[in-house]
Each structure stands twice: as C-alpha cells, then as structure tokens.
Amino acid sequence: MKTLIARHKAGEHIGICSVCSAHPLVIEAALAFDRNSTRKVLIEATSNQVNQFGGYTGMTPADFREFVFAIADKVGFARERIILGGDHLGPNCWQQENADAAMEKSVELVKAYVRAGFSKIHLDASMSCAGDPIPLAPETVAERAAVLCHAAESVATDCQREQLNYVIGTEVPVPGGEASAIQSVHITQVEDAANTLRTHQKAFIARGLAEALTRVIAIVVQPGVEFDHSNIIHYQAQEAQALAQWIEKTKMVYEAHSTDYQTQTAYRELVRDHFAILKVGPALTFALREAIFALAQIEQELIAPENRSRCVAVIEEVMLDEPQYWKKYYRTGFNDSLLDIRYSLSDRIRYYWPHSRIKNSVETMMVNLEGVDIPLGMISQYLPKQFERIQSGELSAIPHQLIMDKIYDVLRAYRYGCAE
C-alpha cells in the first residue's frame, strides 16, 4: 500500500479497488481477475463480518486470512500479493453497550486483526455508544481512534509494523448501507476533513503515537457517491474539487466508500481527484446474484421439474422466514419487500448465501447445469455480455465461468478507473 500511495502522490494515475466481501466466489473472482497481472489485490473484512467472536460469517480475523489464502492457493494467486484490510474497526458491533465496554471489545478486535497479519487498518470510533451524545464530538472520536491505534501498535511485530497502514475518518451513512431512499448526499467539507486530520494528530501525539502517524495513509470522506435500493448518486467531479486540492497538501490520499455502481469514467475521475482507494462490496455480490438468477432461469427451461434446484424460491423462502438482515432496510408491503429482496442494489441477499438451504440449492443448480449443454441462444437471452465473450473465444459456456465473468464485469470498471 505504501508504494501505491507514494506513486499516486508522485503524480501517477494509480489507485486500488478494495474488495469488501466474504463470499468465496467473489474473492475467487477478485484473485483470478488479477492473477496474470503484477497488481496486488486488496481484500477487506468489516468488523461485523469478521471479529474476535466470529461476526456474522463465523470467522475470526485469523480464520478469514486462512479462508482467503486457501482460495488464493486454489486459483494460483501468490499470497504475498494479497493485502488484507480491516474496515470500520471500532465499536460498530457494540454500540448498544456503554463506551468503556464497547471500547474494551474494540481494542481486542484491532489486536486480533493485526495479529492475524491484516496490514490496512481503518480506525473508526465514530459510532455513539450507549449513553454517548449523538453525534460524538470530533475530539472524542479521535481520542478513541488513538486508543485503537495504540492497541494495534502494541501487538504488531517489527515486520508487521513495516507493512502497517492506518485509515482514519468515516463516511455517512454508518456501515451497513442506507436504510431509506436517498435524494442527495452531503459532500465532506474541507474544514471537516482538515479537522479530522488535526484532531487525530493531536490525539495520537498525546498517546505517544507520533511514529504511528506516519503510517496514516488515507482519510475516509464522502466525495458525493451513494446508492440505496434503487437509486444511485453519481460522482460530480466539479463538486469535489475543493477536497481534491486540499489533500494535495498532505502525504495522504482519500478512501471513498460506497463507490458501487458508479461508471468506469467516474472511477477514473475519482482516482484523478485523489480518491485513490475505492471500496466496493454490494456491487460484486449483486453481480453474483444476477448470474445465479440468470442460471436459475436457464435451469428452469432445461431441467425436469422434479430435479430442479428451486434456487430463487429457496432464497425467497429463507429470507422471508429469517428477515433479520433486511427487515429494517427494505419496504414493508409484501410485494415491495419481495422486489427489494430480489433486486435491491443494497443486495441484502449477500448475508444469506452461507445459509445451508440456499447453499445446497445453488450447488444443485450448478450440478444440474454442468450436466447439460446450455444453448448459446439462452446465454444470449440471460447473459448477453458473456454471450459476446463466448463468441469471441474469451469464455466458455460453463456455469462457474459464467458467474466469474459476470463478477469480472464489475472489476473491469474498477481496473479502468485505477490503472496507471
């Protein structure tokens, strides 16, 4: 990461896509996509996804590292080319507890990530805990971030410390996605970004972390990009020029969250304007979902009724029976909620792929389709971009390859934006 940031600050047009997903097919796609390049791949886990208690994936940071490495070994991607990051590390998971208890858990969270070899650490203590004012004072956020930084420094080996990088600040909304429709988004003001940096510098120095400050490579800000269930707010470069000019006076770059569904031109403009770390998550699993739904339609027409996986129906049944991951985000009417379950850009389906019923139905569908020849006309109907690549000899009509290539479409846009 340090080399990439240095190259960007030296004037090169270079950035990096941060893959924020724990889905094995998404991680496989991210690694396979860059297997034959010289680029490193940045894969990040969030604090609610992966933590010392397992998170919603059931994985600790060390488990997640081994999970990613196993996929890398399978696809032939060198482990040393993987950068592991921890996103929103702080009290996000424990906001219902008082600050002392939440921060105690947050300290152990950060230590677990660093011990596991994660080298890009987002210190985010912006969340109010039980009894805290809303919002927190910037000074409090910075002081808590300094506590977390001290925790990271205290367990890092000399070798790890050479690789360790920190990201400070946060975007709006808080991690997890928009819970309601958006019409506009508040772009971070320069004075707020400057205050974030100033308060963190003061808090770090007060804790004896002056050296750690040199490892702060990025600030999270809101450049004016966001999405909800069916709306996308696109990057307007002219609106972010004050931010772009301010960061040039520092040794850092910006990290932009929620960049999913922007155009490839927007990604290039974002990197040009020093938003050099572009995070993506739901767009990748949305592409995965699109591919699986397309294959489910093909299965519906090619496979006898008694042998079909009922993949889409199983997904809907599970999500309706177990609504905890989507209920507070989606609309309430039955038809509306069903549309959101299927097609929301927020893609809350991503929380359900590990469910045993859904996992088994997807596996059944894949086995069914691997045993038949899929007519080209059907691929043209349901996966038209993949049809074109089959025609040009770049791709085979194999279900797994079709899913991979669908995810590659998202990664291709980021490559265009980030490539030197």
Curated annotation (Swiss-Prot):
Protein origin, superkingdom: Bacteria
Pathway(s) of this molecule: Carbohydrate metabolism; D-tagatose 6-phosphate degradation; D-glyceraldehyde 3-phosphate and glycerone phosphate from D-tagatose 6-phosphate: step 2/2
Name of a matching Pfam family: GatZ_KbaZ-like
Gene3D superfamilies: Aldolase class I, putative tagatose 6-phosphate kinase domain like
One GO CC term on file: plasma membrane
Keywords assigned: Galactitol metabolism
Database matches in InterPro entries: Aldolase_TIM, GatZ/KbaZ-like, GatZ_KbaZ_carbometab, TagBP_ald_GatZ
GO biological process: D-tagatose 6-phosphate catabolic process; galactitol metabolic process; phosphoenolpyruvate-dependent sugar phosphotransferase system
HAMAP family noted in UniProt: Tagatose_aldol_GatZ
Biological role stated in the UniProt entry: Component of the tagatose-1,6-bisphosphate aldolase GatYZ that is required for full activity and stability of the Y subunit. Could have a chaperone-like function for the proper and stable folding of GatY. When expressed alone, GatZ does not show any aldolase activity. Is involved in the catabolism of galactitol.
Family: Belongs to the GatZ/KbaZ family. GatZ subfamily.
Description of how the protein assembles with itself and partners: Forms a complex with GatY.
Name of the protein in its database record: D-tagatose-1,6-bisphosphate aldolase subunit GatZ
UniProt source species: Escherichia coli O127:H6 (strain E2348/69 / EPEC)
Lineage: Bacteria, Pseudomonadati, Pseudomonadota, Gammaproteobacteria, Enterobacterales
Gene for this chain: gatZ
